[in-house]
Amino acid sequence: MAETEKEAYLALIAAQDPQIRALLDQGFEFVTNAFKPGAAPSGMKARTEREHVRRLQQEGYQVEVTAAYDEQGQLRPTLSAIWRKKP
């Protein structure tokens, strides 16, 4: 995702989700959308939200997990958005 696309995506989801707006205002950075445990399609190897959170915490980040949205702003119930911030 190019930087301007990422900025547009973050503006879109922040406009509709107050929790995401609050995280951005607090200096959190969007990392990725990740599958919730058990939600990855069969046969697909993908890191779950728990694996992302664990790795980021081990790297010293404060981590938050929110609802995930696609590029059109539609809720993705099988995904979670991962956010990080250095304490």
Predicted feature descriptions by range:
Residues 7-9, 20-21, 53, 72, ...:
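Generic N-terminal initiation segments characterized by hydrophobic and/or small/turn-forming residues
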Residues 64-87:
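C-terminal edge-of-domain segments
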